[in-house]
Amino acid sequence: MTTIAKLIAVTIDCAEPRRLAEFYATILGFEVQYAEDEYAGIGDGAVSIYFQRVPERKPAAWPGPDKQFHLDVRVPDVDKAVQEYLELGAGRPDFQPGDGWVVLADPEGHLFCVCPERS
């Protein structure tokens, strides 16, 4: 039988770890665990997101096959959340693939989807 692993963190390559840690801590309600020039981390006690400095990283084209990864978040009011996230530095790509959720890009161009809570 295969040993089951527990996911403890996802690490995101970026040019400015401190900036992205603050952005995601704000929209997810996580605490900044540490923030340095090379590495930063946020978490909620169960899972963490780490940000690793990779200055040569280039944002993926959207839409396109090289988007690398994206996060999905659930919110009670998609329109309200999107407006708040845009004010925090997110961007809204022109191409939106469907209705009911919105694709945004964080301040460094990583894509994430803002999805409604399930009823």
Question: What residues fall within each predicted segment?
Answer:
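Short, small/polar residue-rich loop motifs at catalytic or cofactor-binding pockets
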Residues: P97-D99
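Glyoxalase I/VOC metalloenzyme domain signal
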Residues: M1-Y34, G43-P93, A105-S119
